[in-house]
Amino acid sequence: MAGKEIKYSTKAREAMLAGVRTLADAVAVTLGPRGRNVVIEKSWGSPTVTKDGVTVAKEIELEDKFENMGAQMVKEVASKTSDTAGDGTTTATVLARAIYEEGQKLVAAGNNPMAIKRGIDKACEVAVKELAGMSKPTKNQREIAQVGTISANSDETIGNIIAEAMEKVGKEGVITVEEAKSMDTTLDVVEGMQFDRGYLSPYFVTDAEKMVVSLENAYILINEKKLSNMKELLPILEQTAKAGRPLLIIAEDIEGEALATLVVNKLRGTLNVAAVKAPGFGDRRKAMLEDIATLTGGQVVSEDVGINLEGITLGDLGHAKRITIDKDNTTIVDGAGKKADIEGRVKQIRAQIEDTTSDYDREKLQERLAKLVGGVAVINVGAATETEMKEKKARVEDALNATRAAVEEGVLPGGGVALVRCLDALSKIKIKSEEKLGVKVVMRAIEEPLRRIANNAGVEGSVVIEKVKNETGSFGYNAATGDYGDLIAAGVIDPTKVVRFALQNACSVASVMLTTEAMIAEKPSKEEPAAMPGGGMGGMGGMGGMGGMM
């Protein structure tokens, strides 16, 4: 078993700082509209070209185990900021490096790291309050497009498509990003509720050319169990035939005699009917059937609630103005559910989203919520090559997350200016002198994103910072044009949530690193030289006799 190597105090923190610097230097080049690309080698296929901070951070593994620990801790900042706010990974990395670097100088000079940590925490708290006070809600589609454009590295097409998608499906709607088959980036919007189950038999098709089923003003029978016995279905089929309206049957499965009878009646023209399997599995299937029932004003036929198939009437069926079914999907548009019932169901799903700890469950609950309140928009990302496609798709996903964050908590002047505007509030904090050092660390660090944006644009960062400090409000440096002015008016805005999480996560990890006193890593095992092959192979000479086999 390999032994352990241990480093203490200054040596440990210096090794960590070397790792932090290596990672932060690679990530920081991507910051701002004039940020540069990073090319990442892949073990197969073409290299990845990216301007996304978290993608760069995830690729970095350092050979020195102590330096690597520092790099991994800052990588965690980037990942966490990306997961919670959807963007701001590069800002978070730049801040974490600056806070740790400044703090490490003070600790190396003999100051108390715990007091510095308390100062950093206090400064972070005050800065977050200041950011909340500066924040303005997104007023219109134009501002949403501006946030998307900035997060997609100044690509206006992406910003406009995201804003259009949000307008069409609402703030709660699901927006997914797919790879397009062409070079154009387009938006498809599905109104109503769509689930991934197609017709059970092609004989249900009403449009043979498009191979789709279209039902207008239709009843919907929602059944939890399998249907195989026709006898159970007959009463309700007779009632719908008398009413002269189409019928959609949703059930766990429909097979045997039941499916055959439905197909025969459809072909004869006795009954305009279609059947699909219920979406989802297990408990999620039950919940989705309840969602469909709420949306269409029907009842789920289930023994659990004492409703059986033979006893139901037309009043128990759901109803929708239009239903479209193809071989893969069913879309229900304009269900007849009561508004109050739908709102109650939405409230219930929102509460479940708040309570769940599983990312997978949260994603599925959000999909259900979107299907009830808005619809689904699909952004199809097009590009000339696969390399460009991957890079563009990552930018669209970033921009989408940032836009959602902006709608949630509002926006701030971008370009690192919002953080610089916190300096005034930080300078007024009254705490013990040693803790005050921690506040000064944060005050120096929050200038760093603006300095880096300016440096990446080929301008001296310190000059830009002084000019911005001498003004107030949303006055700042627009790196895209090289001009100074009102950044909010120029459309250079950042989501409040993104800036807040970047600062909080950076302060958190930098504090942990500053208060580190020992680091433990495995000693690299010495490679044993390979043994020479034994001399017993000489006996193979006897194989010469094999010649007689020829």
UniProtKB/Swiss-Prot annotation:
It is an enzyme of class 5 (isomerase). One of its GO terms (molecular function) is ATP-dependent protein folding chaperone. Its EC number is 5.6.1.7. It catalyses: ATP + H2O + a folded polypeptide = ADP + phosphate + an unfolded polypeptide. InterPro entries: Chaperonin_Cpn60_CS, Cpn60/GroEL, Cpn60/GroEL/TCP-1, GroEL-like_apical_dom_sf, GROEL-like_equatorial_sf, TCP-1-like_intermed_sf. Pfam families: Cpn60_TCP1. GO terms for cellular component: cytoplasm. GO terms for biological process: protein refolding. Keywords: ATP-binding, Chaperone, Cytoplasm, Isomerase, Nucleotide-binding. ATP binds at residues 30-33, 51, 87-91, 415, 478-480, 494. Coiled coil: none annotated. It comes from the Bacteria. It is found in: Cytoplasm. Belongs to the chaperonin (HSP60) family. Forms a cylinder of 14 subunits composed of two heptameric rings stacked back-to-back. Interacts with the co-chaperonin GroES. NCBIfam families: GroEL (TIGR02348), PRK00013.1 (NF000592), PRK12849.1 (NF009487), PRK12850.1 (NF009488), PRK12851.1 (NF009489). Together with its co-chaperonin GroES, plays an essential role in assisting protein folding. The GroEL-GroES system forms a nano-cage that allows encapsulation of the non-native substrate proteins and provides a physical environment optimized to promote and accelerate protein folding. This is Chaperonin GroEL. It comes from Desulfosudis oleivorans (strain DSM 6200 / JCM 39069 / Hxd3). The gene is groEL.
